[in-house]
Amino acid sequence: MDTKSRIVPRGIRNNNPLNIRIGNVWLGEVAVNSDGVFEQFISMQYGIRAAFILLRRYIRHYKLTTIEEIISRWAPEVENKLKAYIDVVCQRTGLPADAPLSYEDQPTMCALLAAMAYVECGQVLDEKKIIEGYKMA
């Protein structure tokens, strides 16, 4: 592994800021995945698009409508420090953990994704790319 690969967070390297595991066929996937565990996308917008599609499914299909419910499923405690994850997302979005979310509320959904990506990758994403990914979803 080269030095750059060790410095750049995996989710950023893979254009997959929420670290979606391999499993679905996504628009914008790379032709050959070299990661083996997490999806890789041809651009950050496609990775963001996939994340928004999953978040929309969580809200509409699974009826997970709060930050706490969404993150509890997204980042189970078995693999993550769940309370810390939720606390950081709440702090960065300015929303309480039990606030009801609507997928149609673009600014809130974009803030949610940005906060989750910050927890997952430790970096702030480009707001324009987040909005573009939301519109692509």
Regions found by a protein language model. Give the residues of each.
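Cell-wall polysaccharide-cleaving catalytic domain and substrate-binding groove, primarily
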Residues: 1-137
